[in-house]
Amino acid sequence: MRKIYTLNAIIFFISFQQLGAQTSTAAKKLLDEVSITIAAYETMIFDFSYVLENRQENIKQETSGTITVKNEKYKLMYLGVEQIYDGEKTYTVVPENEEITITTAKEGEDFGINPTKLLNFYKEGYDYQWDIKQTIFGRPIQFVRLLPSNENDEVKYLLLGIDMIKKNIYRLIEIDMNGTRTTLTISNQKINTPLDKDHFTFDVSNYPDYYINN
C-alpha cells in the first residue's frame, strides 16, 4: 500500500478537540483488537474484489483474486498472476508471458504486494478517527479513518471497515489526493483450514518452458 484537511473555523476545531482525542483512542484500540485476532489465526483463505475508480477521468476498473496466508507465507492469485512467498523468496508467475520473477524478501520489500503487512501497516505514519458505522449484508461494519502523518503523502485518507462481530477486516478504501478511489473488499473468508505442507513451496520443474528472471 503506497498511498491519507481543512478546517473552516478554529472554533470548530476547539469544540471537537476533546471528542477527537477520545475517538482516536477508541479507533486505535479497535485496530489493535483486529490485529491480535488475525495474528492468532493459523491460516487464512479469502477472496477479494478490487475496484479502482476516478470519476473525473471516467475510469473504473474491477478485478478480483484469492489469497492463502500462513504466518508470513502467502499464495496470491490476481489478474491471472500467481505470487508465492515461502518465507525467504517471492515467486511471481506470469503465464501470459511464460515468465517467472524470483526476488528475495529484502529485494521485494519496496514493490509488489505483501498481504501479511495488512496486520500492522496502520501502526506507524497514521492518525486515527472513529468514522461511520454501516450494516452491510446484516453485518455491523465500523469504519476507522486513517490520516497520513506526512502532509506530502499521495493518499488523502484511508477507511478501514471492521466487522464488529468477528473483529476482522471487511473493507479497505483508499482516497488519493488526485480523486482516485480504490476499494478492497474481503469475502468468503475461511479460518484455520489445514494446508498441505508444500502449499507454499515453489517447484520450478512445473514450468519447463518459462523464462526465469532472478
Task: Locate the predicted segments by residue.
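Gly/Pro-enriched, hydrophobic low-complexity segments
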Residues: 129-212
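N-terminal leader/targeting segments and the immediate start of mature chains
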Residues: 17-59, 72-73, 206, 211-214
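Beta-turn initiation residues at beta-strand->coil junctions
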Residues: 52, 94-95, 173-176
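Flexible, surface-exposed loop/linker segments and immediately adjacent secondary-structure boundaries
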Residues: 105-139
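An acidic-aromatic
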Residues: 64-112, 182-183
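Bacterial Sec-dependent N-terminal signal peptides
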Residues: 1-27
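Extracytoplasmic
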Residues: 41-43, 62-64, 71, 85, ...
